[in-house]
């Protein structure tokens, strides 16, 4: 038997093994139950008693040498496999980290929050109501009779003659006065709907309306509150004027303008003293209580505050536009 040749062949096969399964096949070929070294040990019985010990020793030494080669190759393959995994999973610490982009409040939401914050400091609470409204709360109780132009089909989205999408949040004021007794100080922000769509109108938009009902409420109080609100909202000492106007639910009524940077008056909201008929509709005695109401378009104020020219931009979900307000 040529043990040196067997060891040399085993070493060659072990060194060319590139994975654990190939190496294990080499081990079985040489060291398994039917392997070459096992067969050599079985052949010792054919030798004389004098030859057997020396031959057995040489075979065992060769077996140990092959086992050592297999072990070393196995360690090397495991190390290579680990290095390969680590290289694949490595983190390049010089690579800039991935930032998590934070969202921001929509400009309309920012405006509503700003309005609510100001009036909360004056003791006004926030009230909400249904967007699908009935004729009484949307029109009748607001001194808008059946033949009034505001009730025309081209302005209002009707489900049936007495159920519609609300055209203003004034219905919230009616519901509040039905449920609570004066004194009252509320604002009612929310979505409203009118059949109109152009650069300054959308079918759905946001309003904030306010109401104060108590004894001896005056137009002077209304002017003072709205003047302070506009200066606070626009963060400027504005020139403000109250221009006589008409609303069926207030008398007297006024529209409020502010002087723009271009030297022209800009309409920003409407207001007036609550009409006695509105108070009577909710069983409040107009001989005892008076009140004022005001209403403003949120998108209109947002456009003026941020210099936006097209109201429709607020509803187009263009991130290039919205990211400017973060």
Swiss-Prot record:
GO terms for biological process: phenylalanyl-tRNA aminoacylation. One of its GO terms (molecular function) is phenylalanine-tRNA ligase activity. Pfam families: Phe_tRNA-synt_N, tRNA-synt_2d. It catalyses: tRNA(Phe) + L-phenylalanine + ATP = L-phenylalanyl-tRNA(Phe) + AMP + diphosphate + H(+). It comes from the Bacteria. The keyword Iron-sulfur does not apply. The keyword Nucleotide-binding applies. It is found in: Cytoplasm. Binds 2 magnesium ions per tetramer. Keywords: Aminoacyl-tRNA synthetase, ATP-binding, Cytoplasm, Ligase, Magnesium, Metal-binding, Nucleotide-binding, Protein biosynthesis. Its EC number is 6.1.1.20. Its cofactor is Mg(2+). GO terms for cellular component: cytoplasm. Mg(2+) binds at residue 251. Tetramer of two alpha and two beta subunits. Belongs to the class-II aminoacyl-tRNA synthetase family. Phe-tRNA synthetase alpha subunit type 1 subfamily. This is Phenylalanine--tRNA ligase alpha subunit. It comes from Pseudoalteromonas atlantica (strain T6c / ATCC BAA-1087).
